[in-house]
């Protein structure tokens, strides 16, 4: 019997659709995902349509799956003959997809509310939440951009962009942090009108 793998582009066949096809078809194999630079972004392992392993950098299991679900571009390679060194987990594919899509929607909403160039300043107060404490520790007494804080919060491998933005949002709502809009670039509205140059 000939066993054929599947290779393709994530912009044409999104990961959510690919996972659904693999799950519904009861497929077994290793799905390797590559980013735009053709570097390995992560690996998903399936046995009889069930997700039995997920890795993305230092993230594993559900967190790895959620991070990989955000890949909109890149390529994939599904190898049904690969030996599976699964993580000893059995992840419910359908509920992971539902939660993953919810998290993607929430990240988009948080990105609009907390754009990467926005400046974050400490106002005072504390928290006992470990990730919020990490955000505060990374911020320190000065000011940093949302993008810098999110990148700093991801160090350690147990958080993703959703977690970092959610922690920032919660700290802002508690009044511990203040998020200021990005400074307008020179020449934008707010300054005196510039004289027109005649040709």
Predicted regions and their residues:
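Acidic, Ser/Thr/Pro-enriched low-complexity segments and adjacent helix/loop capping patches
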Residues: 1-199
